């Protein structure tokens, strides 16, 4: 199997966690080695909150139109290198308003992700810990730009500190506007968080790997056809699994839960999507057929129109 030739879909990748080292060095006029030390998380962090500490530098950099456009274009290049045919890039607009308005932030990133080589759409992140009104603005902006490249919303941040269930009214509001959503759950927090995401009506869950702790939860995911956006390397860094060999992705996949493979944060986790595939082959003997199934499910669970989904499915079929 030539992993580089497999056509891939990535549904869970954070823009601010996937910055190009050379670009950041150029913008800040700081040596690359110093940037790496500040931008790449330890292979073993204490927990998710520890892992999230490295995001201070990316947020500092991404405060102008130029930097948002440039960092977005860089991410497109990394998709091309990984043979990605479709990606949904996520970021939190509220983190980038030191100078810009929310509209300027979003339109800058939308300009940056335009590409003739890779189909890319945007997911806007609400943040745990932000005020209800601030998060509601994100939903309204997702609705405003739904025909311009924004396809959905997410809830991200310190899951262990802010319960998923506290945000159910926001997802009820998003549902009233027919805005699709995914929710980070079952990463720092456990089954309770996943159940709350299911109750909210999420069709996808970011990470969700702690579903392995409950057969009932696994059955719910299967029954409701919910896909888990799994990020193997990141999960090891944040301590969800002690090693890749003990990561629950294979058990979840074998049990019939729909899963997709993602990098989460390409720079913070120091990993490409090709490398994630290689790691999984080594740990679990996944086959090309397995990966093709996962990518087909990723397309089906994407926030694209049915017509766009079918176009991508056809591309996968032609390649397999």
Residue ranges and their predicted role:
Residues 1-179, 188-193, 199, 203-204, ...:
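Metal-cofactor-binding active-site regions of metalloenzymes
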Residues 181-183:
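Conserved hydrophobic beta-strand within the GNAT/NAT acetyltransferase core sheet
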């Amino acid at each position: 199997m030539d992993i580089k030739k497999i056509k891939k879909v990535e549904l869970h990748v954070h823009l601010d966690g996937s910055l190009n080292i050379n670009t950041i060095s150029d913008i800040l006029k700081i040596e690359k080695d110093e940037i790496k030390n500040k931008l790449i998380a330890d292979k073993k962090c204490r927990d998710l909150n520890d892992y999230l500490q490295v995001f201070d530098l990316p947020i500092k950099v991404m405060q102008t139109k130029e930097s948002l456009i440039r960092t977005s274009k860089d991410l497109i290049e990394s998709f091309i290198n990984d043979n990605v045919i479709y990606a949904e890039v996520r970021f939190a607009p509220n983190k980038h308003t030191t100078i810009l308005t929310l509209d300027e932030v979003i339109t800058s990133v939308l300009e940056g992700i335009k590409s003739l080589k890779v189909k890319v759409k945007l997911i806007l992140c609400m943040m745990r810990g932000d005020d209800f009104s601030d998060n509601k603005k994100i939903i309204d902006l997702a609705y405003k730009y739904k025909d311009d490249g924004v396809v959905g919303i997410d809830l991200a941040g310190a899951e262990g500190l802010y319960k998923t269930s506290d945000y159910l009214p926001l997802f009820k509001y998003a549902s009233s506007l027919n805005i699709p959503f995914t929710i980070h759950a079952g990463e720092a927090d456990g089954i309770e968080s996943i159940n709350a995401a299911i109750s909210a009506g999420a069709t996808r869950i970011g990470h969700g790997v702690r579903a392995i702790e409950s057969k009932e939860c696994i059955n719910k995911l299967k029954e409701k056809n919910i896909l888990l956006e799994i990020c193997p390397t990141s999960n090891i860094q944040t301590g969800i699994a002690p090693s890749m060999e003990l990561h629950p992705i294979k058990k979840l996949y074998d049990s019939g839960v729909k899963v997709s493979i993602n990098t989460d944060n390409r720079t913070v986790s120091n990993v490409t999507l090709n490398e994630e595939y290689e790691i999984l082959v080594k740990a679990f003997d996944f086959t090309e057929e397995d990966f093709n199934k996962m990518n087909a499910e990723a397309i089906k669970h994407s926030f694209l129109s049915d017509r766009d989904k079918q176009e991508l499915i056809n591309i996968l079929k032609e390649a397999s």
